[in-house]
Amino acid sequence: MKLKGFLRRWRPANAQHQLFLAIAGAVFLATLLASPCARAQQAVAPPPSDREVIAELLKRVQLLETRVKELEAERAQGAGPAKPIKAAPIAEIPTRTAPQEENEMAMRDTGPNLRIRGFTDVTLHGSNQKGSTTSFSLGQMNLFITSDVSEKFKFLSEIVFEAGDDNAIGVDVERLLLQYSHNDYFSLAIGRYHTAIGYYNTAYHHSTWFQTAVGRPFLFQFEDNGGILPIHNVGASASGRIPSGALGLHYVVEVGNGRTSRLPLSEAVQNVVDENNHKAVNLALFARPGVLPGLQTGFSVYRDVLAPDNSPRIGQTILAAHAVYVRPSFEWLNEALVIRHAPRGQTRVFHTPGFYTQISRRFGSYRPYFRYQYVNAAADEPIFSDVGLRHGPSVGLRFEASEAVAFKLQYDHTNLRQRPAIDALTLQFAFTF
């Protein structure tokens, strides 16, 4: 009982003392077990008392404690202050990279995500036009790029790889826009955009795969293909809904550099420098009645001042109107416009009218279509002297080979002023990727 009380009062200071206490206990038990044998062998010696045994054990424990202290002192003098044990490299990796991984995941969740979709086509075409040859041609390869910059801001771009008549392939940034969407009634886009003249120019961009026919109507041909409209513009475009109930009114207001005076320049779109200080302005209004889904009617007014070399400045006004009805299995497009050129200092005003109509109906994977187009520019028109009169029908068939591939076969007959009519046949393979 005395031993138990003593052991309860004496508490080791550290783990090493506990170890030596266990050793002392083992010695004590061994002594108790061996004492009968010793008494039997040495009957003449009196047996030791319990107090003497305890005193002997305490003496040994004290000796062991003293030795441990000496060893600890020698170790401290030889190695200096004790250093914390470093974690193994494998344990340090998660601690070191966890914040980086969290930041990267946060950027993936909240930062801009770039999305790219591609469109292109390959055509085989031939005609009876003098000087032309039957050829395979690479169409525009369009990389349509979008990104959600933030909740309100978005990025949109069309990067086009295109071969010219010299067989060289060039790269053009056809659209590049930073778009801000405040609500359904106001959105603002800044950069290079497709001018909201009529319907076709903002409904179909740089991809023949979206279009029913092989190509765009002549009125809406791109500038570098001989088009007469300012298809592209660099500036700002605001758009949105107009509170009008079931009438579904929308507006577009645009201000930009406009296009050059259709001279043989390397670039018709004024991407960096405007040829004059006057800015082109375009106002458009259209309706999408809720009672008849697919119907859209509207008009637009475009105003600019052209500055051709060695000629007086020319005021340009473009009035356009459209009525279209587009459903998944049926399409009917109708657009008409007139381009007014008024040279300063002259009393004569030049008007160039044009229109097209296109209708198609889908039957399963097949969609036959018909288009008729017309444009008539005066021979002495100051800007469109090379356009003249051209009109005629186009008949074609589009076959949906898959959800991403379409085959088109189209025949065109074009009548020209004081020149032979042109008959052409085109086979096109258009696809998206």
Feature names for model-found ranges:
Residues 102-261, 277-282, 286-293, 358-369, ...:
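Outer membrane beta-barrel
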Residues 21-34:
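Bacterial N-terminal signal peptides
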Residues 1-20:
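N-terminal secretory signal peptides that target proteins for export/translocation
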Residues 37-125:
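N-terminal periplasmic/intermembrane-space "pro-region" immediately following the signal or transit peptide
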Residues 269-278, 314:
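Interfacial loop-to-helix transition and helix-capping segments at the boundaries
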Residues 254, 258-272, 304-308:
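Active-site-proximal beta-alpha loop/turn segments in soluble metabolic enzymes
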Residues 130, 168, 176-181, 189-192, ...:
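Outer-membrane beta-barrel pore domains
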Residues 227, 274, 348:
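Glycine- and other small-residue-rich loops at beta-strand/loop junctions that grip anionic moieties
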